[in-house]
């Protein structure tokens, strides 16, 4: 029991003594000497194989210590602040990553514990046990140093600007650093930095008391800046911990960024106080800059850029992995910008490696960013310089000061900003170029003496029915569509208009007229209060005036088809000349059948059948009102019957002849005894006109015992009597130019047995022929 108490007291004393040794950074050499001595004694006491392995592991630890120290010192010269960020990551990520150094140190510590246990069991002397405990403690310290160095080396490799990090790693580091609220006071942050400096001094670094005071002041300032807007935690997630005192130690690094590096430049906005090496290290380490007004990109060296192929745009290395920025109100943005401007004025970080163009860009971007703060879609100070590998700095693709925007190829004007400034909108070209009118004049505002309604004192406004999109007058541009246009047509002469068709003369029926009196075809009606001097159309020039008829557009003699320049507009040609479109259909008869031998053979057989079986037609001239149709009248029944009754429609086709022509009513036509003279089987052809006769003719076929089997259409041409006059009256709306013939069949016919009445159906159901003079 006595020995156990003495051993426990000795362990406590050795622990206190070891903790006291840790407070002094100058005793690292003593610890190494004691480690060597204890290792030598333990190797002499333990077995041969174990001592060799232990000595080899100690020597490996020392070699690794020296190599990692040299590598870390060399990297700290180039990446000063990245080591500080790696220290902070080590403290914030308390239970985070487990490296290969941990496994090595844990194995060594286990072996040390085993050897220490053996030493305690072999010797019970106080001095030896004390030395063993000292060796254990020093070995633990060395393993902890090894773990911190391995983490530092890994973090340095991760923070290298030539090594890309994934978006997931960067976001995890941002989340760990940004949301680490365990250090609520600057004293706690200072304690963490003090412990990290002790580890560094145990490896041979001695920064001095001046560096320690400067670090403490920088940490306090950093804590005040970080916790000044603690209520806005979500927006400050990406606010990073960096040591401002370390930035003062590296003014030389900012100046060493020569013109060769400046040619590769960076893409930045409104400069903040974070313009020095800290922002470079943080942006290259994959950390988000979402709460900074500046985006600084560490570009690749010449050899690295030259090896790649791609468009001549700025290559976004790590800033493309930023999380989406949350919106903040205008007061917080203004306060943050003011704070960043004060920091830049106090510390002057914006002067390292910058030139006069950056300062000019800062002034102009501050001016434009302040104007766009009240707009939600704008991100102030987002991009101010776009750099390409072969052109250097370029002006931003957006409004800069009072200069107009300059669009680029790969992205819309202004980048991600959609601010609506005083953008000069291009005036669209006049849509009335084909009208042969002079260019539009500027818009004149209405004076109090001018009438807002169209009249003689106001120039009419031409509005096409299919106009482009209107650009209403406002801050962005002017109206490019509401343009005053001089009148195209001359005003109508006063007094009643002349006769519409002077060649026809006054019709006998005064109630029949072609156009409303007092108006001209194509001109405005004489309504009271109307003064329409322009024609609302699709931009086609007017070819008629109020003076009378003008020559047709084609300019050629009547009877010829319109030229290709008239776009084959047969309808317009019919209005101009009276020539119907069907007048220009060619090859109406089956004359050119030499190229079709089968068709020629079929036509020959058809003609033979017709000539062999056809009989001479029979007719009876008489008044069917008085003569009743019956088989006894003719002595036979007929296989084919043609009926052409005088429909009322025929009378109204020829103006002025209705008094001398008599027409039958529908009741008179349907009461004919056609079924009495029709044989079975038989066919009936009934002309019904082009109006109501189509339906009435079907009723007649049904009463007479026929069913409709075909509808033959007669397209009437007027090559011989073409005239620009439209022969219609108030009963018709369109000009009728065709007629229909309904074909009915009674009974059943077969080609095999009824060849005398039916044959090969090679004829078409369309007839194109000239019409008679009176329709």
Swiss-Prot record:
Record's keyword terms, sorted:
Nucleus, RNA-binding
Q: Name one GO molecular function term.
A: methyltransferase activity
Q: What is its main location?
A: nucleus
Q: Name one GO cellular component term.
A: nuclear speck
Picking any one GO biological process from the record gives:
methylation
Report whether Secreted shows up as a keyword of the record: no
- PROSITE patterns in the record, alphabetically? MT_A70, N6_MTASE, SAM_MTA70L_2
Subcellular localization, per the record? Nucleus speckle; Nucleus, Nucleoplasm
Q: What happens when the gene is disrupted?
A: Embryonic lethality: arrest at the globular stage of embryo development.
In the UniProt record, does the keyword Transcription regulation occur? no
**Low complexity composition bias: residue spans:** 40-49
Pfam families (alphabetical): MT-A70
Q: Which residues fall in a compositionally biased region of kind Polar residues?
A: 375-400
Q: Where is this region: Disordered?
A: 1-424, 520-569
Compositionally biased tracts (Basic and acidic residues):
1-10, 50-79, 100-117, 125-222, 229-278, 333-344
The UniProt subunit note reads as follows: Forms homodimers. Interacts with HAKAI, MTA and VIR. Associates with MTA, FIP37, VIR and HAKAI to form the m6A writer complex which is essential for adenosine methylation at specific mRNA sequences.
Q: Which family does it belong to?
A: Belongs to the MT-A70-like family.
- What PANTHER family is this protein classified in? N6-ADENOSINE-METHYLTRANSFERASE NON-CATALYTIC SUBUNIT (PTHR13107:SF0)
Q: What does this protein do?
A: Probable non-catalytic subunit of the N6-methyltransferase complex, a multiprotein complex that mediates N6-methyladenosine (m6A) methylation at the 5'-[AG]GAC-3' consensus sites of some mRNAs. Associates with MTA, FIP37, VIR and HAKAI to form the m6A writer complex which is essential for adenosine methylation at specific mRNA sequences. N6-methyladenosine (m6A) plays a role in mRNA stability, processing, translation efficiency and editing.
Q: What is this protein called?
A: N6-adenosine-methyltransferase non-catalytic subunit MTB
- The species this protein was found in: Arabidopsis thaliana
């Amino acid at each position: 029991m006595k020995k156990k108490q003495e051993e426990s007291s000795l362990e406590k004393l050795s622990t206190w003594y070891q903790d006291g040794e840790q407070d002094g950074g100058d005793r690292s050499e003593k610890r190494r000497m004691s480690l060597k001595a204890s290792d030598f004694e333990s190797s002499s006491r333990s077995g041969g194989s174990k001592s060799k392995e232990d000595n080899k592991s100690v020597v490996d630890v020392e070699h690794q210590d020296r190599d990692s120290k040299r590598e870390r010192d060399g990297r700290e010269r180039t990446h000063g602040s990245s080591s500080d960020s790696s220290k902070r990551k080590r403290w914030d990520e308390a239970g985070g990553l487990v490296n290969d150094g941990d496994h090595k140190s844990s194995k060594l510590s286990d072996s040390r514990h085993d050897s220490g246990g053996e030493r305690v069991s072999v010797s019970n002397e106080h001095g030896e046990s004390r030395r063993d405990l000292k060796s254990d403690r020093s070995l633990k310290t060395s393993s902890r140093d090894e773990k911190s160095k391995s983490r530092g080396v890994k973090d340095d490799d991760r923070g290298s600007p030539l090594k890309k990090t994934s978006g997931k790693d960067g976001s995890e580091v941002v989340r760990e650093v940004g949301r680490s609220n365990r250090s609520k006071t600057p004293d706690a942050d200072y304690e963490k930095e003090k412990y990290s400096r002790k580890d560094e001094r145990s490896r041979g670094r001695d920064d001095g008391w001046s560096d320690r005071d400067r670090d403490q002041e920088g940490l306090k300032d950093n804590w005040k800046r970080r916790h000044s807007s603690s209520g806005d935690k979500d927006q400050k997630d990406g606010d990073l911990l960096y040591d401002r005192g370390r930035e003062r130690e590296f003014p030389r690094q900012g100046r060493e960024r020569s013109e060769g590096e400046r040619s590769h430049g960076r893409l930045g906005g409104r400069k903040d106080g974070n313009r020095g090496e800290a922002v470079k290290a943080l942006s290259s380490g994959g950390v988000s800059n979402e709460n900074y007004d500046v985006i600084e990109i560490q570009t690749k060296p010449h050899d690295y850029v030259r090896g790649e192929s791609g468009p001549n745009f700025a290559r976004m290395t790590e800033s493309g992995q930023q999380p989406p920025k949350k919106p903040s109100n205008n007061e917080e943005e203004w306060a943050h910008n003011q704070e960043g401007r004060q920091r830049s004025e106090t510390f002057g970080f914006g002067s390292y490696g910058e030139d006069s163009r950056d300062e000019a860009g800062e002034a102009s971007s501050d001016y434009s960013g302040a104007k766009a703060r009240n707009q939600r879609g704008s991100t102030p100070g987002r991009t101010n310089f776009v750099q390409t590998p072969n052109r250097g700095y370029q002006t931003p693709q957006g409004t800069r000061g009072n200069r107009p925007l300059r669009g680029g190829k790969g992205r819309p004007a202004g980048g991600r900003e959609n601010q609506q400034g005083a953008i000069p909108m291009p005036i669209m070209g006049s849509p009335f170029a084909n009208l042969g009118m002079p260019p539009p004049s500027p818009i004149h505002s209405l004076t109090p003496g001018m009438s807002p309604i169209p009249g003689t004192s106001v120039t009419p406004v031409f509005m096409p029915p299919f106009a482009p999109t209107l650009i209403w007058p406002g801050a962005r541009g002017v109206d490019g569509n509401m343009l005053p246009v001089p009148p195209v047509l001359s005003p109508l002469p006063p007094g009643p208009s002349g006769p519409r068709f002077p060649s026809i003369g006054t019709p006998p029926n005064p109630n029949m007229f072609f156009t409303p009196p007092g108006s001209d075809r194509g001109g405005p009606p004489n309504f009271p209060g109307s003064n329409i001097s322009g024609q609302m159309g699709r931009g086609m020039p007017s070819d008629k005036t109020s003076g009378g008829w003008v020559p047709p557009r084609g300019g050629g003699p009547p009877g010829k088809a319109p030229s290709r320049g008239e776009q084959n507009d047969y309808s317009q040609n019919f209005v101009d000349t009276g020539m119907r479109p069907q007048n220009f259909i060619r090859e109406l008869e089956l004359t050119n059948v030499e190229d079709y031998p089968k068709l020629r053979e079929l036509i020959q057989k058809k003609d033979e059948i017709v000539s062999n079986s056809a009989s001479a037609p029979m007719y009876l001239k008489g008044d069917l009102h008085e003569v009743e149709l019956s088989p006894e009248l003719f002595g036979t029944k007929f296989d084919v019957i043609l009926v052409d009754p005088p429909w009322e429609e025929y009378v109204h086709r020829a103006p002025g002849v209705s008094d001398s022509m008599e027409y039958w009513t529908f009741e008179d036509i349907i009461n004919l005894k056609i079924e009495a003279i029709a044989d079975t089987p038989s066919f009936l052809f009934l002309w019904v006109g082009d109006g109501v006769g189509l339906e009435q003719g079907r009723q007649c076929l049904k009463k007479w015992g026929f069913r409709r089997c075909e509808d033959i259409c007669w397209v009437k041409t007027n090559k011989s009597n073409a005239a620009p006059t439209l022969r219609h009256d108030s009963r018709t709306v369109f000009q009728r130019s065709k007629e229909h013939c309904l074909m009915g069949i009674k009974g059943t016919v077969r080609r095999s047995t009824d060849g005398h009445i039916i044959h090969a159906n090679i004829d078409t159901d369309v007839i194109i022929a000239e019409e008679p003079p009176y329709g």
